[in-house]
Amino acid sequence: MLKRIKPDEIHLGMFIEAIDGNWKGQRFWRSRFLLASPEEADTLRASRVEWVVINTEKGTDVAFADVKARCLSAEAQLTRALKTVEQSKPLIKSIFEDARDGNSLPIDVAMQVVDDIEACMRDSSQALIQVTRLKARDEYTFLHSIAVAALMIHFGRSIKMTDATVKELALGGLLHDVGKVKIPPEILQKSGPLTDAEMITVRQHPQNSFEILSRHGNISEAVLDICLHHHERTDGKGYPDGLLGEEIRPQVRIASICDVYDALTSRRAYKKAWTSDDAVKFMLKQEGQFDRVLLRNFFYSMKF
């Protein structure tokens, strides 16, 4: 059976029947061959080829390759997830420091982090989500940003959102709490209950995030909306604007689910991490706070 796939879907063991696109000048002197060399696979993925036709009777299929990719050892997945997190933390920290100091934000760096998280989520999604659940007090905001971005990617893909929308979700998840740089660390890192005055200060962070990012002309409306309204609730009891139901765009409703889910399932100095099931069951009991259709779909997507 012949199947037309994108170059980034190819894997070793596939039989290449035809190459569609500008492949002249590449080192593929033939267009029908068994892909057995990692070097050829990398060259083909990096080429200007638009489509590749594979013959599943002579080589492996995409489905087989996907299974093989998912079957990476648990140790390999954990290693990759840890590496992604460790590489991302200083980059996110630098973005937040620029925001704190009033500097122009390096959005290209933020997109680099998004791309790294997206790549890791393709074959190590469970490991990455697990790794980000253990958060040191002074790193909570940075790891929470990675976790929410990862959850948004995972959920967006599971409900078949476009690649562009998923990337937008991820950027919103990564930057949604950047406004917390305006909040004193002693409030953010407080292990006990916040006073009323402290709570008012904390609740200013969505508006802070919006104002910081609004200074950049290349931030989409959806990302700005995620930053400003991720604490809104469908029953109208959220903040800062008390939006109700459909007044909250779907991307923001997804962000609110991922934001709360990560907070509940994260291990902190003052609380144990909740299980995924317990977190979603708790959220389902919060009548009217979350989009129930999206929340149930999110719950199903987390059944790794």
Which sequence ranges carry the predicted segments?
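Non-catalytic interface/linker regions that flank or bridge core catalytic/transmembrane domains
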Residues: 1-135, 139-140
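Histidine- and acidic-residue-rich, metal-dependent catalytic cores
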Residues: 87-304
